[in-house]
Amino acid sequence: MAASCGSSQLPAAEPPLKIPKMEVLSPGSPGALSDGNPSLSDPSTPSGASPLGPGPAAGGAGLGGGGAAGGRGGASPSVSFSPGGAAAAAAAAACRGMSWTPAETNALIAVWGNERLVEARYQQLEGAGTVFGSKAPGPAMYERVSRALAELGYERTPSQCRERIKTLRRCYSRVKEHGVGKRKSSYTFEQLEQVFGQGGWDSQPCQPVLINSSGLYQELESDGSTMEEYSQEDWGNHSQDLHCYQTGEQELDEMPTTKRTLKIKQESSEDAQKRDVMQNIMQILESVQLKWELFQSWTDFSRLHLSNKLAIFGIGYNTRWKEDIRYHYAEISSQVPLGKRLREYFNSEKPEGRVIMTRVQKMNWKNVYYKFLEITISEARCLELHMEIDWIPIAHSKPTGGNVVQYLLPGGIPKSPGLYAIGYEECHEKPRSPLAEPRGADPSNETPGELEVPSPQASLRVEMESARIIYCYLGIAEVRTLQQCLFLHFQANTKTFSKEWVGINAFLSQNCVVEPGVSPKSIYIKFVEVERDFLSAGSLVECLEKAIGYPLKFNN
């Protein structure tokens, strides 16, 4: 058993108490991972002094309920004056268990960062690679950490250092993943990011910019005080509001306002994006003029032609007061067969079907309808290209003394078959003409300066409209790869032109010739990989034209 913190004074006649080897508390012990508890803190305890007596001990009583025996009491004379001062220090550490003061925790973070960097350099010298993570830290490293803490005035065993590092790594991982924790802490997220952010012994590039003890203590010691003089409350003033997870039974605090606001904004942005996608799908369904079919029974979805088809489908409804059918939901079923997806929307055991059944039972809706348009795999990828793939701008360079611009294709274009699109940023050379018309139909009544100074609303409109990218070509990389096709478009000359590509190639080549002081049009590309066997199926150009709402200029 570890020495009790609250042991009563022993009779003077008894022989000196022998301190057995201390037992390190496991992480599952009550309070073992607590960061601090003001009721048990004693920040005034100087470094090298122990609450158990004048013998050498750890710097400061532990914060939190991590002590193996609970309260703090006077030490017996046998313990205080026994020749084994190191044993008394071990007893003090055992009494604190895994409870760490803010000063100890920050010192551990700094020392661990230094040791981690040294370990990585050793591995480089040994030829083990230039990354953290070639091997996990061993007992020797925790012994070095323990000795380094002792030099700073904090007596901690290698086992305690190992358990505390594991706790800090869990804190960092959970805060990194969830962005929220249980309580405030004396250390900042940036500290953990610099120490554990390189992957935590995973394969990541070696970054020598790590926290060190001198840099960590410099700001706190500049006012003449020492780390031990800071109480738990004072530490809160010198640290950020890091909410980290601990494995004790603690209440989950509310998410900080800034993080909560950021999460709300992120969710609202995602919801807006989903609404835009669904609106686009509804426009596609309306453009092909499909008829609504009334849902009557489960036999509607047992038909063979619904079983394994991909499709664009919509769910609609009407009410007793209005017979017009309105959309409830629309989706491109590009991964799951249409029959399976529709069954989910008409199965009361599924979340989607439960919503529909509830609204019908409560007479919010009168009837439920559905419509669908079968699509091929290549058409599904084409719609994915339009709705989910972002545009990539094409850079260009101008040779010295010439008026011909050269395109610079980005790296990472796949050497595989697929679909690609080329677009350009819409140029508005006359953005002010609609705003100038209300001033009067007679140009003589207008002064030249009036048309040259647009209003703030006009500037905003020009900025918003100029960001629109117009599709002009859809390419199918079936015989050649995506990389080869795009290279032929952007790097071709008159010798490599073909009749099939003369339209888009002529446009791109003409855009390379610019007048002095005039920039070429901004060109963009996007692409998606598709298996070669699927590219020949479907009407891809018409599919994309229906989705974007206008014809492709260079495909016709």
Curated annotation (Swiss-Prot):
InterPro entries: MSANTD2, Myb_DNA-bind_4. Residues 99-169 form the Myb-like domain. Residues 1-82, 431-458 are annotated as: Disordered. It holds the Pfam family Myb_DNA-bind_4. It comes from the Eukaryota. Residues 56-74 have a biased composition (Gly residues). Residues 1-10, 36-45 have a biased composition (Polar residues). This is Myb/SANT-like DNA-binding domain-containing protein 2. The lineage of its organism: Eukaryota, Metazoa, Chordata, Craniata, Vertebrata.
